[in-house]
Amino acid sequence: MRKSLFLVIIALFLISNVAFAETSHEKVEKDSSAIMVRLGLLKGYQGGDLGLEKKITRAEFATIIIRMLGYQAKPFNPKPKISFKDLSKKHWAYMPVRMAASLGYIKGYSDKKFKPSNNITYSEAITIMVRILGYDDKLEGKWPDNYLNKAKEIGITKNLDVVSKKAMTRGDIAVLVVDSMGVEMK
């Protein structure tokens, strides 16, 4: 009987901690997304839903970082001209992707494609944020571990459960971007 009671108490303790952790992450996501909405970095879908649980594409993330950097309102004539085989001038995110690539924050794949409709992974998004913060491709180690380690070191992933090849959600991106805003640029 005592052993059963002890196991029940342990189980309740573990369940309450898991529930608290989920609630805590959801709060960080909501707070971060609210900041991004106020700054004009994150836009909702029709009806106002932010879709924080939805995966985010590479094109959507490029658009967010260009807004974050303030280039949306400035004239921009990137040199050298960067182009990707799968990104036409008619694509809705053509300019943000081109700007981010010209600035050196975004790189395409070895087949010279950008794959704008692919979901962005933790490794890809974190690499871009680390580059924006002033760290270049000369980080020690191999990609993506070198960027993931630098991100952890500078504190931009402290509120994320990073899974390298997993697609990020809009909520996760909000947390990453807001946590990056608190880091001094190199």
Description of each model-found segment:
Residues L176:
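Surface-exposed binding/hinge segments that line
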